[in-house]
UniProtKB/Swiss-Prot annotation:
Signal peptide as annotated in the record: 1-18
Gene (UniProt): FCER1G
Biological processes, Gene Ontology terms: antigen processing and presentation of exogenous peptide antigen via MHC class I; antigen processing and presentation of exogenous peptide antigen via MHC class II; cellular response to low-density lipoprotein particle stimulus; defense response to bacterium; Fc receptor mediated stimulatory signaling pathway; Fc-gamma receptor signaling pathway; immunoglobulin mediated immune response; innate immune response
Subunit structure: IgE Fc receptor is a tetramer of an alpha chain, a beta chain, and two disulfide linked gamma chains. Associates with FCGR1A; forms a functional signaling complex. The signaling subunit of immunoglobulin gamma (IgG) Fc receptor complex. As a homodimer or a heterodimer of CD247 and FCER1G, associates with the ligand binding subunit FCGR3A to form a functional receptor complex. Associates with CLEC6A. Interacts with CLEC4E. Interacts (via ITAM domain) with SYK (via SH2 domains); activates SYK, enabling integrin-mediated activation of neutrophils and macrophages.
InterPro entries, sorted: CD3_zeta/IgE_Fc_rcpt_gamma, FCER1G, Phos_immunorcpt_sig_ITAM
Record's keyword annotation contains Phosphoprotein: yes
Record domain ITAM: where: 54-82
The name this protein goes by in its record: High affinity immunoglobulin epsilon receptor subunit gamma
Phosphotyrosine found at: 65, 76
Gene Ontology molecular functions: IgE binding; IgE receptor activity; IgG binding; protein homodimerization activity
Amino acid sequence: MIPAVVLLLLLLVEQAAALGEPQLCYILDAILFLYGIVLTLLYCRLKLQVRKAAIDSYEKSDGVYTGLSTRNQETYETLKHEKPPQ
């Protein structure tokens, strides 16, 4: 695909040399526009793949609290109040 693009650009350069100044700008603008569209599509595709991978990895785990267990001992213990000797 890359050699085809290079060949196309070389053909456009020969034609562009024969064109006037405004027409050359239009050709360059079209190339930049297509380049921007391709980059935008690749960026969106990458974002969707990363998001899908994150969702898949989240579904594989049991949840946020994986590995935690309940304690057998109560958190709060009652204090034994003893009267001081008199």
